[in-house]
Structures are given as structure tokens and as C-alpha cells.
């Protein structure tokens, strides 16, 4: 295991000691050791070398409550700013954000801040909570959770470029912001987690429709929550009643890995059957071309290329265009 990985994982293990999640230490270190030996991306070591080249800076201000903004342009000289931007661009494509680092605007494909603005008013206060973000991407929402006062934020996502992007951002925060010791990313899926039944809040945003067995996935989310804990689920939905579920064909909006798109009523039934209560649909929103688009930080195809050019209410395959719902529920 490289020095960087060892440091990242050890920091996570240390934060779990004497916490409600301490029993995770019975399995987690061995799991991460196996990951390091058998599952690392071919580019991973190169990415780590690039991370090591990021300069150490001293951001004078960090804002995680209204954005993810680390420092200002005036904190660094022009050469250092260009060096930082050049290195961060080596980790493209940047899909989830945006981030602001010493005056550099990482203009990501998704305006994840807009999603957070739709979700945040409807959830329990995160202050003092242990939070799990399943399918955390590059960690944008994790930082916002920390900014809301969460005691501990753990993100899980098997995509290793997201893992690297998260640590690129953390590199600029870790030495200037004490709570950064309480935010950790583990390169794994929820299916690799033992049922901890210990998190106060579990987020899963943009994952359910990628699962062949959505009921099993929802059960896995439930298994991570303590009794009374809160689930925040965001996913693609379709219009209809409690019997309506769209199973996409080979592709949906050019994505091959989309399986089930339920109506909000059907999704409510699923959650109820699995033992959730206080289930409420708090937001339904059509994804716009301003919220998901190509940028200089993600310069390949995006949403506009996946919709019918003659009718943007339909995907290029003829399905209803992406509509996303946020559902909040509690474990009985």
C-alpha cells in the first residue's frame, strides 16, 4: 500500500475508534487491504504522483455552508494558481461540483449545489450526526454535509477517479480546517459493507436506477441506519401510480446501466414494504440543460446530447426525459 493510501485509510480507522461505528473496524481494514492488492485502477499510481505535486497552501477562508470554496486567489501567487489548475485538470472529467479553489472555478458537469439546495430544507439537522453518503461521487455533497455540522461523514463509491478528486480537494482543506479530520472516502460499494445499523443519516442520490435489484439496494441502505435513522433518497422517477415502473431497454439517455425508474407512488410502496415509515416525497424536478452540461472541466457529451433534438421532453431513445425525486423516510 502506498504512503498516500495508508495515510487516508488510517485516518478513517482512527476516526471510527470509540464511535458508534467502531465495530466496522472488525472488517474494514482487511477489505481495504484486499482492494489495494487486487482492485486498483491502472492509472491510480499516476494519479497519486500528481496529487503529491499539489502545493501546500494556507487558505485564509473556507466556506462549506453555502458552497465548497477553499481560499481566495490572493492566497497564492499567479504561478502557484496556474500550477494548481494544471494539476487539477489532470483529473478530468470532473462531473460533480462545483468547487472553488484559490480562485479556480472547477465548473463541473453537474450543478450539484442545485441538488443540495433542493434537498437540504427537508432533512433533519445534520449537526452532531454520523452520516453515510452512498455513491458519493467526488464528494461535493459530503463537504456540504460537513458544512452543516455533521460529526462524521463517510462516503462510499467504487469509482477511483472520484476517490482521487475527493482527496485533491481535501489536500487544500486538511491542514486549515479541523473538521476535515472527520470526513472520509472509501473506494467501495455499499454491497461490500457489513450491516452496521449505526448511521444517523444515510444519503443515496443518483444510484437506485443503476441497480438491477432495487429492493436489495434499499434494504442495504436500511441496514446501515440505526433505528429511527433518516434516509434521503434521490433518484430518477416517471409519472404514474403505485403500479408504474419503467424498465429501460438497452439504454436510457445513452446510459447502459439504467434499470428501474419507478413512480414516486411505487417507490413509496417499496420503502413501506421494507420497513420505512414517515415516507414523504419532498421534491420532484426535471433535470435542465443548465444543471447538467458540458464544460471545460468535462468536455465530452452531456444531457443535451442524450435528448431528442426535436423534443427535449423525451430521451434520444423515446423515453420521458430525466425527472428526479427526493424522498425522505425513517427506519422503524
Swiss-Prot record:
Q: Which SUPFAM superfamilies match?
A: S-adenosyl-L-methionine-dependent methyltransferases (SSF53335)
Which interval of the chain is the signal sequence?
none
Keywords, A to Z, come to:
Transferase, tRNA processing
Q: Which InterPro entries match?
A: CmoB, Mo5U34_MeTrfas-like, SAM-dependent_MTases_sf
Q: List the disulfide bonds.
A: none
Q: Does the keyword Transferase apply?
A: yes
Which positions in this protein are listed as binding carboxy-S-adenosyl-L-methionine? Answer: 96, 110, 115, 135, 157-159, 190-191, 205, 209, 324
**In Gene Ontology terms, what is a biological process of this protein?**
tRNA wobble uridine modification
One GO MF annotation is:
transferase activity, transferring alkyl or aryl (other than methyl) groups
Q: Which reaction does it catalyse?
A: carboxy-S-adenosyl-L-methionine + 5-hydroxyuridine(34) in tRNA = 5-carboxymethoxyuridine(34) in tRNA + S-adenosyl-L-homocysteine + H(+)
In which domain of life is the source organism classified?
Bacteria
Q: Give the EC number(s) under which this enzyme is classified.
A: 2.5.1.-
The record's section on NCBIfam families has: PRK15068.1, tRNA 5-methoxyuridine(34)/uridine 5-oxyacetic acid(34) synthase CmoB
Q: How does it assemble?
A: Homotetramer.
Q: Describe the function of this protein.
A: Catalyzes carboxymethyl transfer from carboxy-S-adenosyl-L-methionine (Cx-SAM) to 5-hydroxyuridine (ho5U) to form 5-carboxymethoxyuridine (cmo5U) at position 34 in tRNAs.
Q: Which PANTHER family match?
A: TRANS-ACONITATE 2-METHYLTRANSFERASE-RELATED
Question: What is the official name of this protein in its record?
Answer: tRNA U34 carboxymethyltransferase
Amino acid at each position: 500500500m502506498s504512503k498516500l493510501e495508508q495515510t487516508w485509510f488510517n485516518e478513517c480507522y482512527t476516526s471510527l475508534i470509540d464511535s458508534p461505528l467502531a465495530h466496522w473496524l472488525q472488517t474494514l481494514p482487511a477489505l481495504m487491504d484486499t482492494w489495494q492488492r487486487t482492485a486498483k485502477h491502472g492509472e491510480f499510481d499516476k494519479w497519486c504522483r500528481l496529487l503529491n505535486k499539489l502545493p501546500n497552501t494556507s487558505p485564509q477562508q473556507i466556506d462549506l455552508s453555502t458552497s465548497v470554496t477553499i481560499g481566495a486567489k490572493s492566497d497564492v501567487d499567479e504561478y502557484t494558481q496556474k500550477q494548481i489548475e494544471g494539476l487539477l485538470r489532470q483529473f478530468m472529467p470532473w462531473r460533480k461540483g462545483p468547487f472553488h479553489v484559490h480562485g479556480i472555478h472547477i465548473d463541473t458537469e453537474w450543478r450539484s449545489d442545485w441538488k443540495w439546495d433542493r434537498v437540504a430544507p427537508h432533512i433533519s439537522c445534520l449537526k452532531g450526526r454520523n452520516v453515510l453518503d452512498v455513491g458519493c461521487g467526488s464528494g461535493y455533497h459530503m463537504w456540504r454535509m460537513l458544512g452543516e455540522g455533521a460529526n462524521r461523514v463517510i462516503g462510499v463509491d467504487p469509482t477511483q477517479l472520484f476517490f482521487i478528486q475527493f482527496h485533491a480537494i481535501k489536500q487544500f482543506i486538511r491542514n486549515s480546517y479541523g473538521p476535515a479530520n472527520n470526513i472520509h472516502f472509501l473506494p467501495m460499494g455499499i454491497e461490500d459493507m457489513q450491516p452496521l445499523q449505526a448511521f444517523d443519516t444515510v444519503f443515496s442520490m443518483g444510484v437506485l436506477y443503476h441497480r438491477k435489484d432495487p429492493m436489495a439496494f434499499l434494504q442495504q441502505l436500511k441496514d446501515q441506519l440505526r433505528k429511527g435513522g433518516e434516509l434521503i433518497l434521490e433518484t430518477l422517477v416517471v409519472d404514474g401510480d403505485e403500479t408504474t415502473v419503467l424498465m429501460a431497454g438497452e439504454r436510457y439517455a445513452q446510459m447502459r446501466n439504467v434499470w428501474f425508474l419507478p413512480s414516486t407512488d411505487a417507490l413509496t410502496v417499496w420503502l413501506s414494504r421494507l420497513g420505512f415509515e414517515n415516507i414523504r416525497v419532498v421534491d420532484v424536478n426535471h433535470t435542465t440543460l443548465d444543471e447538467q452540461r458540458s464544460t471545460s472541466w468535462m468536455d465530452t457529451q452531456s444531457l443535451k446530447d442524450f435528448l431528442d433534438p426535436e423534443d427535449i421532453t423525451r430521451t434520444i431513445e423515446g423515453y420521458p426525459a430525466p425527472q428526479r425525486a427526493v424522498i425522505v423516510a425513517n427506519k422503524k
